[in-house]
Amino acid sequence: MAEAVDEDSGVGRSLEESSNGQHSQAGEALSEWRSSGQVENGTPSTSPSYWDIDDDDDYGLKPSELYGQYTWKIPKFSEITKREHRSNVFEAGGYKWYILIYPQGCDVCNHLSLFLCVANYDKLLPGSFAILEAGWSQFAQFTISVLSQDLKKSKFSDTLHRFWKKEHDWGWKKFMELPKLKDGFIDESGCLTIEAKVQVIRERVDRPFRCLDCGYRRELVRVYFQNVEQICRRFVEEKRSKLGRLIEDKARWTSFGVFWLGMDQNSRRRMCREKVDVILKGVVKHFFVEKEVSSTLVMDSLYSGLKALEGQTKNMKARSRLLDAKQLPAPIVSVDKDMFVLVDDVLLLLERAALEPLPPKDEKGRQNRTKDGNDGEEVNKEADERDERRLTELGRRTVEIFILSHIFSTKIEVAHQEAIALKRQEELIREEEEAWLAETEQRAKRGAAEREKKSKKKQAKQKRNKNKGKDKRKEEKVSFATHAKDLEENQNQNQNDEEEKDSVTEKAQSSAEKPDTLGDVSDISDSVDGSADILQPDLEDRDSSSVLWDTDALEIHPPSSEGSSRGRGISISTPNGITEGKSHSTMDDSSSTCSNDSIRSGVTNGSYQGNSLNFRNQKSPNKGKNQQVKAMTDAHSLASETDDQPSTLGTDPKGQNYSSEASNVGESDWVVVSHIQEPEGSRNRIPVGRERKTVQSIVNSVDMDRPKEKSTAVLSSPRNVAKNPSPLTQTKPEKKSISTADGIPNRKVLATGPPSSSQVVLPSDIQSQTVGLRADMQKLSAPKQPPATTISRPSSAPIIPAMRPSPITVSSSVQTTTSLPRSVSSAGRLGPDPSLHNQQTYTPQSYKNAIVGNSLGSSSSSFNHHPSSHGVVPTTLPSSSYSQAPTSSYQSSFPYSQDGLLWTGRSPSSVNMGMYNNTYSPAVTSNRSLNHMDVQIAQQQAQSMMTDEFPHLDIINDLLEDEQCSNMVYNGSIFNPQPQVFNGQYSSYHGELLSGGRTRSFGEEGLHYMARGPYGTDGMMPRQWQMTNMDLSLPAMRSNGMEDGTSSAANYHHSYFGLDASNPSFTSGINGYTEFRPSNGH
């Protein structure tokens, strides 16, 4: 433990020795001088009064009381074998000390190690001594020296250290080398002398304090004077340079001068004062450094300078050996009680402090420190006094500069910086205010400019609006005048239309008053009432089965008086389809005969606009159920019909729509001509003249629009049937289509279907007349159907042959049904079988073949007036199914019908298309003879009418003959070789009928072509066939409601019934021609 402490002390000592090398270099002379002066002389010091005075300080013990020294003589030093050797304990400054040496060195070799140690350090307690009030810790400065026989060569070392419990010893491990001890340090007896001087320092922190004893201080001044002077001069030069830079900076100096002079006297006086305690604390803190040996001398110098400064202030006269008054500079700082005050103006003091130099350095130094008797003593005393006065002056100047610098840097300069900052802030505020004012002015200018601009814009806008208002009023005036003019023209036009309508209505009423024998003529149909109810199922719900289709014939037996009293009210009710394979028709087996009332093939109610009627299929609201339609006819409706009403065919086999078109003689297109009933007052008539001007454009538009429709709607004018051949309708069994045409709102439709898969209903000349409904038919309710465009051709339009375009296909699926033997007459009377195969519609785009009508597969129907005197075709011909029936239909101008329906057709192209779809090769006849025969028949029927009742029929028949002949000539040849295919239903009798002709194969079309023979159909019909019990007024029935005399020419279709060799009704009749006799025997 002791070794470790000694080792540490040795390290401390060695370090302290190295730091005090200058003192060690003083040599033995200095050591001897110091020792001899103290020991031998013993006279009081001659230092200045402020240098040695410390009695005015009442802060504990004086430095002289805290000083002690001890000399230790070690005999026979060379014989010591111990590692360490201690001296006796001595007391200094209230502490007990001892000297510790290591003869062989402490942790070093060949060196002498010396340490000063505090005795009983482990027993020391805080506060045991007066000087240790703060505890066990003491600051002390001590000197250890090894005396030589020549005192000038003595070796010594000085150090400053704070002793405390863990650092209770301090010294030098390498104090000196062992070989040097033999150079006069060990005397002849082998004794080594070691001396220790200890100064316990009474430290303070609030002000400079006296540290050293006067004798000990003088000894240290001779060694460390230059160090003390350097410390003080460095500080003063630093402050002077700072002040000099301030003065050299003209701007700052001028600014500071302005600031300082701008301050009032009280402010300047207050700023030039500072408390003493504040200044002195700063002095002690700045200059006292514990590790510096010279710090004690610097503190003694400052203490002496502070005393000199205070003495100058008090004008103390008690001065011994001081510098003369002339040599003393003017003071900068004075002491006023507890305040340091600047004695003059700050500007002057700063210039003076910056320019006034410090006392010059002493370049001589001490050169001889040896003892030369009394002379030497006097010289040393003068040197000591001179050094002390210099240190006192350095201390005073240092304190003054420190006070001036502190007051300037902490008060005046800070105030100056604050003033500058405030001024700058004021300038910035002023600049901002100016900028704000300028911006406000600019904003005001911009606002005024914008307001002016807006005002101008507003004025311009108001001006534009004013001009617009004027222009608008002018335009309103002009438009009002134009509108008034248009209204006036419309009123005039309406008046003209009303007049024409009234004239037409009056003419129609006058024609309606003529007696009509239609009821007698159409005796072929069963006894039915003027109105009929029909159940019409949905198109999708039809059953494809053909087992019980013969039971679909609906017979309605109204009172017989109804048919006799109103012969013109003709009705027919036919099946319109099968729902889920079940018949929804009502059968009455009580009667199989025909009444005077004809079978109504369809009743169509609809609106009439212009020259056309619009028909459209409409599904019934509930699937699988029939829609019951009631239709009533009135005799007066015949008189109210116009020239423009078209006829249409309506069939719906297999739940799908079958569409066909009314056509002229010579074209193979089977169409059921419908009689349209319409309330008399609900029609809007268009004059014939206007119709004739627009019909060509309408026809073209309709022809172009037909391919876009899902179904084909065809109507032909009743008046112009002889002149206007209708387009072709062909069927295809593979394709299905639902005919949808624009229907007429608030109109109920009753349609019938043909009884065979290839049979299509065709209206005759008599049945092509359109019958109007009674007035009370307006009350009937029917589903509203959207309108479709229908066109009727005017009476006087020329017949122009048209090029046949590519066919437009409309397919409909057809079902066939087999008629029961029981219902032969019923099936024959009630209408065609609904089983029709698909047909392909071909529409020539020419005025001649203009299409007028609507879809035939929906609820459209026609009134077919059949002569009551003729019988029906017996059922010996078997009904073919869909797969067995030929797919091509023969559509001739002869309205052959096995069931008593009327058929018509033309268009050889339809035959060709039908032949490609047919698996059979039916017989062919020429088209020319059919056309010619129709003309003859129409003429003979017209001649057989009563002349007094119809005086204008001769003229009409002549016109028809001429026009028909022109048509045949225009077509290119009287012998038109284009084949006309009979309906497959006539395959059973065409052999007998045409047996006189010779057949040949027509390889191109795959059909049998029959040349015109004397016994063929074309040859055996030179004139009209006279039917038994035929009403001669039937061909003239249509003429009753015509506006002009040419209207009867349109009704050239004649009723030819089914021909069969086994049929007993097929007998010789009038004029040698075959006569049809009805099955009832009449």
Curated annotation (Swiss-Prot):
Residues 67-198 form the MATH domain. It is a peripheral membrane protein. SUPFAM superfamilies: TRAF domain-like. Residues 1-54, 358-388, 440-666, 697-762, 780-800, 812-841, 858-889 are annotated as: Disordered. Disruption phenotype: No visible phenotype under normal growth conditions, but the double mutant plants traf1a and traf1b, or muse13 and muse14 are extremely dwarf when grown at room temperature. Functions redundantly with TRAF1A in the regulation of plant immune response. Contributes to the turnover of the nucleotide-binding domain and leucine-rich repeat-containing (NB-LRR) immune receptors SNC1 and RPS2. May associate with an E3 ubiquitin-protein ligase complex, which modulates ubiquitination and subsequent degradation of NB-LRR immune sensors to maintain their homeostasis. Functions redundantly with TRAF1A in the regulation of autophagosome formation. Required for SINAT1- and SINAT2-mediated ubiquitination and destabilization of ATG6. Forms homooligomers. Interacts with SNC1, RPS2 and CPR1/CPR30. Interacts with ATG6. This is TNF receptor-associated factor homolog 1b. It comes from Arabidopsis thaliana (Mouse-ear cress). The lineage of its organism: Eukaryota, Viridiplantae, Streptophyta, Embryophyta, Tracheophyta.
